[in-house]
Each structure stands twice: as C-alpha cells, then as structure tokens.
Amino acid sequence: MGDKARRKWLVLAAWPYAYGVPHLGNLIGSVLSADVAARFLRLAGDEVVFVSGSDMHGTPIEVEALKRGESPKDLAERNHEKIKELFERWEISFDNYSKTESPTHIKFVQDFYRRVYENGYVFSDTVQLYYCPKDKIFLPDRYIVGTCPYCGYDRAYGDQCENCGRLLEPTLLLNPRCAICGSTPELRTTTHWFFDLPKLTDALKRYIEENENLPPNARNMSLQILRDGLKPRALTRDNKWGIPAPFPGAEDKTIYVWMEAVLGYISATIEYFASKGEPEKWKEFWLDPETRSVYFIGKDNIPFHTLILPALLIASGEKYVLPWTVASTEYLLFRGLKFSKSRRIGVWIDEALEVFPADYWRFVLVSLRPEQKDMSFTWEEFLRIVNNDLNDNIGNFVHRVLVLVQRKFGGIAPAPLDFADEDLKFREEILARSREVAEFMYAFRFKEALTHILWLSSSGNSYLNFRKPWELDSESARTPAFLALHAVKALAIMLYPIIPRSSQEMWKLLGYKDDIANHRWHEINEAVPPGQELPSPRPLFRKISEEELKAAVEKIEELRASRSS
C-alpha cells in the first residue's frame, strides 16, 4: 500500500438538506462514513477528493421561510453555515463542503441541462399536478403523502416509498393528501419539462450488470426497477426557490431539487480545484475512466445514484465517470424507532456534541454502522461501547504499554532482544490485523474493520498478561515492551480514520512530533524506533458513569425545551 500504485478516488457524501440539523442516522449513513473512507484512502497513499454540500433549494425551505417571515435564501444560508460548523466540530475532513446556491453549482447545472436538452433527452408536456387550494401552492413530490400502490405503506412520498424503495409519481399514490395541512389536494393542469429516462434503459442495464463493484442490495433494487420499466422523470417545478430552468419556454420554472442537487458532486469538485488555482484539474478525476467514485448514501437514496445520476451523466454526452460503487447503509434507529424530531425520538448532531466528545460519538456510530441490517442506537449501548471497547479495551492497553515503558525504561522506546514463539506470534498478529483491517476499509465495511482493530488491542492485553513484563528485569522486558509499543503504533494508525483526534494524541504519546495524517498505512509494519523518547503517559479515554449518562440525557432534553420555548 505504498505511494507507487496511487489510485484516484472521488469520495462523495449525500448532501444534507439545509432544512435542519442532521441526526445521528443521517451522519453515519453518509458524511461520517465518507470521512472514514477519505481518511483511510489518504493514509493508503491514494489521491482523494472528498466533497459534499448543503442542499438548499426546494419547497420545504420555501414553506418554512414563509412561516418565519424571512426569505428562503436567508433561512437556507443560516442553516448551511450551522451545518458546516457542526461538521468541523465532528472532525469531518472535507476538501470542499459546498452548497447548491453557489454560483459554480448554479452555472454548472444550467449548462449541464442545456446539453442534455440539446442531446434530445428533455421534452415538455402538459400534466396534471396536485394543488392545495388551502395553501394555494402546487405540491411537489415530497409534499404529497399517501399509500404506496406497491407495498401499502401509508406514509409514502410522491416521489418514492421509503418502505419498499420504489420510485413513484404523485398520481400513483392512493388516498393522497397535502403534507403541509393534511387536506385533500386537487389536480390542475400545468406544463413541465421531463428527463426521458426510458431512452437510457439499455445503457443503464449494461452499466448495472457490468459493474461488479455495486453491493447486492443496490444491484438487485436497480435491476428490479429496470424490469418494472422506467418512466420519464420531472425536471422542473413551479416553486420559485431553486435554480431557474434553462429550457426554452420554461422561464417561470425551477429545476427539481433532486435533479440538481445530485449534480453537486461534480460542481463541488470544480469549485474545489478552482479555489486551489487549478480550474481544469477536476477533469482529471471526473473524466478519467480509472477514477473510482464512491457515493456514501442511505438505502433510500440508491435509485437516484445507480439509475438517475448515471442516466444524466450519459445523457450529457460528456465522458463523466459513472458511479464505481455506492456504499449504502441500512437504517440506524433509535431504540428500534425511526428518528423523529417532532416526536423527540433520537439524537441530533448538535445535541450530541453538547454532552460527549466527537471521538466518542464517532467510535460508537462506526460500531453501530448498519452495514448489513438496521441497527438500533440506545444509551445503554453507547455506555457499553465507550466503557468496554474504547476505554477498557483500547484505552487500557495503550495506557498499560506507555506506563510500562515509562517505569522500566525511563520513557525511552527499547530495542528488542531475542523473540520467543509467543513474541513472534504477536508480531505476526499485528501485521495480519493491519492487512485484514485494510481489506475491510477498502470494502467500506468499517464496522467489521473496527471489530478487527478491537481484536488486536484485546490480543495486546492478553500478550501482556502472558509475558508479564513488569515482573521481568529491564533486559528481559525489552522484547515484550518493544512489541507492545509496535501494537500501539498500529492501533494509532488503524484508528485514525475513525477517531482522528484521539489517534493524534496516541501518536504524540509514542514520541512522534508531527501529524499522523502525514504518514502512511504501510508504516504499521515498522516498530517505534528504539531510543525514541516518549512523553509522560496519560489516559486517552475515561469511563462514563450511569449518573453522568443520565445527566447527559437530561441536558439534551433541557436544550430541546429551551429551543422550543
């Protein structure tokens, strides 16, 4: 995993909607998972561009701004800045966190759709759309709810059922109602512009069938949608808060928020390289077929990234690299229930940082990452993971080793003597775990990677208990102390993508003066240099008592009460 075989990666996190603060499920489903990937790939020596941004347009922002008596732009900008600041506090290492209201994005979207239109993939048609006579607005997809005609779910949206994942049209819903006021809407005639998705059926089928990197759930869902038959997708909306549609005759329309935000991955990359004074370099990523683009999304976003986005990229006539894979997750629940702000179910990312450090949360969320099935967050599980895994397993091993070196060798990393069988076995485990963890990281299976990291620290504790170097004379304690320090270095590097701040602290406690991010994964193979001076040891983590946890939960409730009053 040295620098000689550098790959180019686009690490792309689904764009948070600037309607409010994301919750923990949103975070692990996209942005946090993408950050773990980006940090690992940089450690691996690859060339990485990691972007996301705030999705600022659409009816929800427009309606909320109306209620508050302010402009949609002011509301969205304020929320964007808040979300951006929160991501910084969560240690998210974006190369660029952009927004759909940026001039670069607006220009790119309009130019992009002009090309799609000129290539014959856009047509206009008169359609009947739901209109709420009470609120006096046309109701876009997400503002119509009703019963899914496929699975019977009674809270399906007009564009997609979140229960079965099927793409929908508002008129397909049974018992439709206005999501704003709950009244029954009426159908009215209006003209809209559509993306001719069915024209691209064969190209999409080839892309899905030939792409061996797509996970089974994404492949199967996409093929099922193709078998059911694709339908044209609306490109325009009647609401005013959005990017003006560039099609002739569509001067009073805006681009549908889903169909413009999904292009933000490209515009954010363009914006990033322009800010670095390299305005053409984005093409080295987006127009190079060897580039690996990975989209970190929840399972409800799969069709937009495996079908609609590839179709748009193909329709543009440019040679944009199609999604290499989607790293989709199942749902993170809160005590078995979906997160809901109105019902106070869940924890939001601003609240979380008011009670515990970001690294504690990052560690817990990766431990609970719903890679194969829905996972449930509970406060009891949070306490168990922090106390047992982070503190007692990793923290205890690291501190034991550092204290041993301080007491036996005056804080100077020792050189080894002869290696006994148990020493050789432990050294091989360090190297083997490094390879295994890297494989899971490259497969974006971070929960499993963390399990193997924990196995290494558990083995380290067992190794120390077996060798008992504190009972040996200084000469005999050299080899076990040398290997234990090697394991701590391995843990610092392997944990860096997950808990970056704590890993940097671990790095400093090993006597390194620089930033761990400047090092490479393959350096796990190298032990801490004998003679390196270590600072005085101090615990990296601490246990959380049940009383402290109870106080934290109460503090979150108090914060919510103060905000709603």
Curated annotation (Swiss-Prot):
Note on cofactor: Binds 1 zinc ion per subunit.
Pfam family, one: tRNA-synt_1g
Motif ('HIGH' region): 16-26
Positions contributing to ATP binding: K341
Cellular component terms per the entry's GO annotation: aminoacyl-tRNA synthetase multienzyme complex; cytosol
Localization: Cytoplasm
SUPFAM superfamilies: Anticodon-binding domain of a subclass of class I aminoacyl-tRNA synthetases, Methionyl-tRNA synthetase (MetRS), Zn-domain, Nucleotidylyl transferase
Keyword ATP-binding annotated: yes
EC number: 6.1.1.10
UniProt key word Acetylation: no
Binding site for Zn(2+): C148, C151, C161, C164
Names of required cofactors: Zn(2+)
PANTHER family: METHIONINE--TRNA LIGASE, METHIONINE--TRNA LIGASE, CYTOPLASMIC
Protein name listed in UniProt: Methionine--tRNA ligase
Species lineage: Archaea, Thermoproteota, Thermoprotei, Thermofilales, Thermofilaceae
Gene coding for it: metG
